[in-house]
């Protein structure tokens, strides 16, 4: 199938390779061969050239801009605005001015059964049963009534699938989730299995309830229900919280319960530390353990990634060369990690040189390699260069995927070239790579940034029509854009839609809603949602507490602050508790002063 006409306009050159070479071989403060050297080594019984990095040179690299003046890519014809093409009915709201129109042509082009975002549990559980249970938990937990007694009266046919689905619905609300989990454990004839335990472990890990998490892990150990996933959840949680010693301590628990600590387990921990920007700590751990196991390609790759994430290219180069010295040939994954590391460290010219070496000496760049480069060019608004790389990828026989197109869509959308965005979406369909969840989220973000929430809603509806499940991030973006535009009714309608779809609000969801309600002047309603957050054990939202408190202060209602202070203190939110307690005192003094004056 032929490419979209506008793409050909970017190919004004005798050869894609020739044009790219103009970008790849550019002037720099030092010679490319000095930066990246190749040495002949015998790998696997045959002589091959290996790329080596001169780590010392990283300390004196001078960033050389590779941007070239670019012109706007003309289109052969004008197109309608993107939102008109994706238009369909928005969220239900009495005052909504969202168009009910729908472009049938685009609808027919956007068939996509790929689901992203909220994870779905494959089970035979009746959705209505899940809904009933969640409704009871929602209504009775917040009111502090006997939730367990009502659940008992429901005479549920408990199954592991039901437990997992309910926990999934409350994955951001640890207190109701844990209370339901404990209630289920006490039901006669039911016992948790590894899957339900791991679901609860994930919730505790995400909310950093480490003491409870370890207790659950040990309980699993006594029942013989531990799996490698259990330990992985705990290791990743401690690493994400930068608790290196506790993460390493999971090894001791593995030994206690007779689990083998192999290279995969060590790689998992090193990777978790690296992703938490603890590259140095990952290296120290590796140096302590390297005599006890045989590192493989993945081991060096995760170490490389850890150093690249903290922008330490000298150590990254050392790991790279270490890998080669141990007889391992860096694969395409390692090369892509290094590409990202160079770009993250603002060494664009050096990333381009490495990319050129990959094309000439191997491993040949894959779609991920091109995506890394194109994404960076798009971030810098160097769209013509991004198109050059896109064309070269196609000419190399690689099929662009939704991720590459999403980068281009974001780049052109940021420049407000919505006609070009529309053409890209059209081409995605024609090439058999329809938009996925991330593409739709990128489009919604573009609309939100341009303060066009109604158009974001239309894109959301298109997403639903194409059977792509929205993520919590999708709803948060749309809800925030409506509140920013002071369309409070539609902002609340988005919240209602999210709850209706069974998506558990996270900390950001509550923060957006509470800020919107305060801005609307509905501090009492905002107070109700703040109490709900505290009751669920969620983080205290970052809001203007002084503005929030001033409304109640003027009304002379100190008991509201006292209640909030007590709830915050009980939930361990001591800073917020102090703020509420201070406002309670101020309000009481004011009330007393008024009484004396009267």
Curated annotation (Swiss-Prot):
InterPro entries: Pentatricopeptide_rpt, PPR_P_subfamily, PROP1-like_PPR_dom, TPR-like_helical_dom_sf. PPR repeats lie at residues 193-227, 229-261, 262-292, 296-330, 331-365, 366-400, 401-435, 436-470, 471-505, 506-540. One of its GO terms (cellular component) is mitochondrion. This is Pentatricopeptide repeat-containing protein At5g14820, mitochondrial. Belongs to the PPR family. P subfamily. Residues 1-98 form a transit peptide. Keywords: Mitochondrion, Repeat, Transit peptide. It comes from the Eukaryota. It is found in: Mitochondrion. Pfam families: PPR (PF01535), PPR_2 (PF13041), PPR_long (PF17177).
């Amino acid at each position: 199938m032929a490419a979209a006409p506008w793409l050909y306009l970017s190919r004004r050159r005798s050869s894609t390779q020739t044009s790219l070479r103009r970008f790849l071989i550019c002037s720099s403060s030092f010679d490319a061969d000095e930066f990246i050297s190749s040495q002949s080594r015998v790998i696997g019984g045959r002589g091959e050239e290996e790329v080596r990095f001169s780590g010392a040179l990283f300390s004196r690299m001078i960033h050389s801009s590779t941007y070239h003046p670019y012109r706007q890519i003309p289109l052969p014809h004008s197109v309608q605005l993107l939102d008109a093409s994706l238009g369909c009915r928005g969220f239900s709201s009495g005052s909504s001015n969202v168009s009910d129109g729908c472009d049938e042509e685009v609808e027919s082009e956007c068939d996509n059964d790929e689901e992203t975002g909220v994870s779905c549990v494959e089970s035979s559980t009746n959705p209505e049963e899940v809904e009933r249970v969640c409704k009871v938990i929602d209504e009775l937990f917040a009111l502090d009534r006997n939730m367990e007694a009502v659940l008992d009266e429901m005479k549920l046919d408990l199954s592991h699938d039901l437990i997992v689905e309910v926990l999934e619905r409350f994955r951001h609300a640890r207190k109701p989730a844990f209370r339901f989990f404990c209630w289920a454990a006490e039901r006669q004839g039911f016992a948790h299995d590894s899957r339900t335990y791991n679901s609860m472990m994930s919730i505790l890990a995400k909310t950093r309830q480490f003491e409870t998490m370890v207790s659950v892990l040990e309980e699993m150990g006594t029942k013989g229900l531990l799996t490698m996933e259990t330990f992985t959840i705990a290791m990743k949680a401690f690493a994400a919280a930068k608790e290196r010693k506790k993460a390493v301590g999971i090894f001791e628990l593995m030994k206690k319960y007779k689990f083998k600590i192999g290279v995969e387990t060590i790689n998992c921990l090193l990777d978790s530390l690296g992703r938490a920007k603890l590259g140095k700590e990952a290296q120290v751990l590796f140096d302590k353990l390297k005599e006890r196991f045989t590192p493989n390609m993945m081991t060096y790759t995760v170490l490389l990634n850890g150093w690249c994430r903290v922008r330490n290219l000298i150590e990254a180069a050392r790991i790279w060369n270490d890998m080669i010295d141990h007889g391992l040939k860096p694969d395409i994954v390692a090369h892509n990690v290094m590409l990202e590391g160079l770009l993250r460290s603002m060494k664009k010219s050096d990333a381009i040189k490495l990319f050129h070496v990959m094309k000439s000496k191997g491993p040949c760049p894959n779609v991920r390699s091109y995506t890394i480069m194109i994404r960076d060019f798009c971030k810098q608004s160097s769209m013509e260069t991004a198109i050059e790389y896109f064309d070269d990828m196609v000419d190399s026989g690689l099929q662009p995927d939704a991720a590459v197109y999403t980068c281009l869509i974001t780049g052109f959308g940021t420049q407000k070239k919505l006609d070009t965005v529309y053409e890209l979406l059209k081409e995605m369909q024609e090439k058999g790579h329809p938009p996925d969840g991330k593409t739709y989220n990128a489009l919604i973000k573009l609309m939100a940034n341009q303060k066009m929430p109604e158009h974001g809603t239309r894109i959301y509806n298109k997403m639903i029509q194409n059977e792509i499940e929205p993520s919590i991030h999708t709803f948060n973006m749309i809800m925030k854009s409506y509140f920013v535009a002071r369309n409070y009714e539609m902002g609340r309608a988005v919240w209602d839609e999210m709850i209706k779809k069974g998506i558990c609000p996270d900390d950001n969801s509550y923060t957006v809603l509470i800020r919107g309600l305060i801005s609307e002047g509905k501090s009492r309603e905002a107070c109700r949602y703040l109490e709900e957050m505290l009751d669920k054990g969620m983080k205290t939202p970052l809001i203007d507490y002084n503005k929030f408190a001033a409304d109640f202060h003027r009304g002379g209602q100190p008991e509201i602050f006292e209640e909030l202070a007590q709830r915050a203190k009980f939930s361990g939110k001591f800073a917020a508790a102090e703020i509420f307690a201070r406002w309670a005192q101020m309000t009481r003094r004011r009330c007393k002063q008024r009484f004396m004056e009267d």
